[in-house]
Design a protein with these regions (language model features):
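N-terminal accessory segments
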Residues: 1-28, 32-33, 52-60, 65
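N-terminal glycine-rich flavin-associated loop
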Residues: 27-60, 78, 82-124
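Short active-site-proximal "capping" loops at secondary-structure junctions
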Residues: 44-45, 67-69
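Short, ordered loop/turn segments at secondary-structure junctions
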Residues: 64-67, 125
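Active-site glycine-centered loops adjacent to acidic/histidine catalytic or metal-binding residues
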Residues: 66, 103, 134
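Short acidic, glycine/serine/threonine-rich loops at helix termini
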Residues: 71-76, 110-112, 132-133
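Glycine-rich anion/phosphate-binding loop at the beta-strand->alpha-helix junction
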Residues: 127-131
Length: 134
């Protein structure tokens, strides 16, 4: 895992067991301890991380709030948390559509659409804490 340090210009990596254990579970019953946790800050960081994973045969799971009840945000590979700095939104076609980054909370997306009398499609019970990115 030392090679990952050179992937992005300023990666935020967590390889200590205690840090990885914090991401070993989501709201589901599943638990997998990832090999590393990173928080890419921009698209360039994500691109470098994807290139690293491809060339090293490891997987990346992108994660935001971790509210999944089915284990979609746990992995033995690399967890890439995309919350901080990933909260932009754009209303399109006069409210007929919305473009969201992964760190936007579902309930917040609905607030953005409220003036247009619209809502996003999914309506989970966790809408006020679930994020678009999973």
């Amino acid at each position: 895992m030392q090679g990952i340090v050179m992937v992005a210009e300023q990666p935020t990596l967590h390889r200590k067991l205690i840090d990885r254990l914090a991401y070993a579970h989501d709201a589901s019953m599943y638990r997998l301890v990832p090999e590393a946790v990173t928080r890419p800050e921009n698209e360039s960081d994500v691109k470098c991380l994807l290139e690293y994973a491809h060339s090293n045969g490891t997987s990346i799971t992108f994660r935001t709030a971790g509210t999944s009840l089915s284990g979609q945000t746990v992995t033995k590979g690399i967890i890439a948390e995309v919350v901080r700095g990933w909260k932009r939104h754009e209303i399109l076609d006069n409210g007929a559509a919305i473009q969201l980054q992964p760190g936007v909370i579902g309930g917040r997306a609905n607030l953005y659409l409220q003036p247009y009398h619209s809502r996003i499609g999914p309506d989970p019970a966790s809408i006020e804490s679930a994020m678009i990115g999973g």
